[in-house]
């Protein structure tokens, strides 16, 4: 299957991320349509097992799960329906802007392949820094993780566009009581050379490995008090990334 439309039967069952693999090798696929409808009894007992399509995009039957966004769908901007709670966005050839609902009352679980080469921005509509689960700062998407005993106020970089062409990026300052969880969302960006990291942030030690760090990264500037260990500093230095405290 390399082009055209795919007629998905409602009886197929899968989790959303597996759809990415099902449709691999279909770069010309521009829309998905579903055919037969399940009974109300079926959808009540297995609501995530049945699918429907809307504007060429594949969802679970209640639209609460976005399963697959066609590679060749030509819209440059796409707004995730309000009722959609679980989203998986695979690599797309035309999509440049994704809009999600980030109002405080709206639960939302977001997953996007970092290899997406065209998506320039994810706009969290209604999002407020450190108050809602998602918010946008410039063209970078942030996420406040669910509170737990271990991570009461953890914040993450949820999406850093591969297309963002700034040579340096400074993580925004963070309020007292919050902290950035492991920073590791920059590895496929070929522009970034310098990363500025505040004290309340953990840089993932795995970024010392070539495949997990930006290919042109040459310096990480830490704020005084950052908890990066000496062994991690030494590992970065051995791989050509200088570490200093000039945040």
Indicate where each model-derived feature is located.
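Solvent-exposed loop and capping/linker segments of extracellular ligand-binding repeat ectodomains
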Residues: 1-247
């Amino acid at each position: 299957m390399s082009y055209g439309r795919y007629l998905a039967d409602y009886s197929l069952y899968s989790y959303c991320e597996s759809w990415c693999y099902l449709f691999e090798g279909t770069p010309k696929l521009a829309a998905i349509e579903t055919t037969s409808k399940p009974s109300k009894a079926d959808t009540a007992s297995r609501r995530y097992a049945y699918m429907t399509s809307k504007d060429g995009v594949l969802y679970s039957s209640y639209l609460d799960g976005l399963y697959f966004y066609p590679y060749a769908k030509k819209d440059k901007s796409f707004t995730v329906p309000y009722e959609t709670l679980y989203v998986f966005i695979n690599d797309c050839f035309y999509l440049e802007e994704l809009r999600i609902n980030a109002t405080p009352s709206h639960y939302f679980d977001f997953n996007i392949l970092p290899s997406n080469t065209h998506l320039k921005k994810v706009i969290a509509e209604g999002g407020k820094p450190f108050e809602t689960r998602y918010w946008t700062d410039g063209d970078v998407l942030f996420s406040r993780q669910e509170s737990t005993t271990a991570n009461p106020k953890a914040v993450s970089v949820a999406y850093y566009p591969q297309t963002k062409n700034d040579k340096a990026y400074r993580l925004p300052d963070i309020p007292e009581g919050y902290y950035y969880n492991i920073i590791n969302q920059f590895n496929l960006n070929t522009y970034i050379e310098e990363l500025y990291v505040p004290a309340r942030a953990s840089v993932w030690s795995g970024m010392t490995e070539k495949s997990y760090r930006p290919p042109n990264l040459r310096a990480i500037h830490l704020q005084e008090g950052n908890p990066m260990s000496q062994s991690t500093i030494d590992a970065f230095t051995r791989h050509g990334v200088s570490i200093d405290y000039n945040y």
